Amino acid sequence: MKNTMKLSALLFTSAFLLGACGQEKKEETTIATTQATTTTATPTTVYSLEDAQKAVFEAASNSGTDTMTLYYKDDVLLKEEKVSTFIISKLAGDNPLEMLKKAAGETKEKLKVFIGKGVEYNTDYKDDVFTITNSYDYTKLDMQKLKEVYPNLNLRDDKTLSYSEFKEGLLNRGYKEKQ
């Protein structure tokens, strides 16, 4: 049962840890008595992956590992890449492979509107190892829509996620930063 709980926690960690970096451009319209004027709000900082810093975190158990690579600039999380591997023969339960496939399918279904628009989600099974590979490019995602799917996202006022808060959450969940 403990392994099942760990498995579930590992599988859904990325879904609950999603952050944001999408920027919204807002337009305002001012109407004069005889003339309409359109103005644009002051642009916010747009982040790019080109000059991002990188940090790698890992969590391991006897039944698998999670490796998460984070890209960030200043205190803004820009992208998350995660590879979760599960050794099927070391998992508890009657049919852990089917359980993993079902859970992964449910997660992929929940994310389907974002796939190809900032989210990639893939699974593979080979030689007793089930692998889930996913990435979230927060510079491309519509973060407001993502917040609708995951209401617990801790978005800041500028629609970004704090890298330092994200990192702290990983460390609190048992991840170790790789040097």
Feature annotation, model-predicted:
Residues 1-19:
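Sec-dependent bacterial lipoprotein signal peptides
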Residues 5, 19-20, 124, 136:
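Intrinsic disorder/low-complexity detector
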Residues 6, 19-32:
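Bacterial lipoprotein signal-peptidase II cleavage site
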Residues 14-17, 38-40, 179:
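Sequence termini and other peripheral, non-core segments
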Residues 26-49:
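Low-complexity, Pro/Thr/Ser/Glu-rich flexible segments characteristic
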Residues 41-179:
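Subset-of-secretome marker
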